[in-house]
């Protein structure tokens, strides 16, 4: 596809999340608490990709993601590319990378885990598998997969 064949129009300022696993963009919008009454969003679902076969793309006009949102995004779309757009120019392109350990982003799905008590303890998970994502709680060793993670957002 050439640049003249864009399926979704360019945005002036904001964020573009590209290379999302096909049919996962709605989970990301839910995590970002979008749509809302003020933010223009463009979503392409299950479009052709030379690298991935099929992918999703999200364009968010007038908003850049917070670090907290990026930390959650990497769990839902670890292979995604995050682009910051200003005055129609891509000023920063970041390839998301899932670290070997995740801290204070999600909660253990085990209701008896110490992290779900009133104790002031850090929520820590080892990344057992990056694709598909599997996390293991540092304290109780409960494993969590994509659906367990996504349901928290």
Swiss-Prot record:
InterPro entries: Asp_carbamoyltransf_reg_N, Asp_carbamoylTrfase_reg, Asp_carbamoyltrfase_reg_C, Asp_carbatrfase_reg_C_sf, Asp_carbatrfase_reg_N_sf
Lineage: superkingdom: Archaea
Chain positions recorded as Zn(2+) binding sites: 108, 113, 137, 140
Cofactor binding remark: Binds 1 zinc ion per subunit.
Cofactor requirements of the protein: Zn(2+)
Cellular component GO terms held in the UniProt record: aspartate carbamoyltransferase complex
UniProt-recorded Gene Ontology molecular function terms: metal ion binding
Record keywords: Metal-binding, Pyrimidine biosynthesis, Zinc
Similarity section: Belongs to the PyrI family.
Physiological role: Involved in allosteric regulation of aspartate carbamoyltransferase.
Name this polypeptide is given: Aspartate carbamoyltransferase regulatory chain
Lineage, broadest ranks: Archaea, Methanobacteriati, Methanobacteriota, Methanomada group, Methanobacteria
Gene: pyrI
């Amino acid at each position: 596809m050439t640049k003249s064949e864009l399926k979704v129009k360019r945005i002036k300022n904001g964020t573009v999340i590209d290379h999302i696993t096909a049919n996962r963009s709605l989970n990301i919008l839910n995590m970002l608490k979008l749509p809302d009454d003020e933010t223009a969003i463009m979503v392409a679902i299950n479009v052709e990709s030379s690298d991935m076969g099929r992918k999703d793309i999200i364009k968010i006009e007038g908003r850049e993601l917070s670090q907290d949102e990026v930390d959650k995004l990497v769990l839902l779309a670890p292979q995604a590319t995050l682009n910051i757009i200003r005055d129609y120019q891509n000023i920063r392109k970041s390839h998301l990378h899932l670290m070997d350990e995740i801290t204070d982003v999600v909660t253990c799905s085990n209701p008896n885990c110490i992290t779900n008590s009133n104790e002031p303890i850090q929520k820590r998970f080892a990344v057992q598998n990056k694709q598909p994502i599997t996390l293991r709680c540092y304290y109780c060793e409960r494993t969590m997969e994509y659906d367990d993670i996504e349901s928290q957002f």
